[in-house]
Amino acid sequence: MARPSRDGYDRGMKALVLALCLIATPVLAQDVAGRFDYYVLSLSWSPSWCATEGDKSGAEQCAAGRKLGFTVHGLWPQYEEGWPADCRTTAKNPSRQETAAMADVMGSGGLAWYQWKKHGRCSGLAAKDYFALTREAAKRIRIPEALSAVPRDVNLPAKVIEDAFIEANPGMQPQGITVACRQKALQEVRICLTRDLQPRACAPDSQRDCAGSFLMPAPR
């Protein structure tokens, strides 16, 4: 069988590279800092995270006696379909002091640093402004009294938690909150907000709840 000429091989490789670039370009073009549609405020249920991950690594937020309930996992820029991550930005990274200062709402400075790298850079904000916005978003959401101090482990369906948040936060709508589970335990509550932190409906790809009942372990 005749071998292809070197010129023919080069032309074929150039065509392949061009095709791959045309496929990849729309994806890469999406993840530009500051270009997104809304935010998701993710509130992690610390007892579940500590039981599955944090205790094993000796995480700061899982220290004995802290008895943390809901903490901020992150404030995530979202598209109406999908989400950006690890965006390129000219914003400077936060100092260790700035990330450590977020431990009171996020559980640890390490998590604040990770969230900045993956999500904060996509906000188009300076690090200090992104953390200030994260803190403000958390401040605007009232944790239902019944869920702020769970005295013992309980099994609940997602709707009970959603209804409690909606009742405690006027303006929040059923389509604007989702409950996520992991290993049959409550993982997080995710609340959709406009760019100026007003309640809004989540995009369809973010409206996924836990199926059935799940464990909500008590803080310890």
Task: Please place each PLM-identified region on the residue numbering.
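Sec-dependent signal peptide recognition
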Residues: 13-19
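N-terminal signal peptide c-region/cleavage motif recognized by signal peptidases
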Residues: 24-26
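N-terminal module-boundary/linker segments of secreted carbohydrate-active enzymes
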Residues: 30-50
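Domain-level detector of nuclease and nuclease-like folds
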Residues: 40-42, 54-220
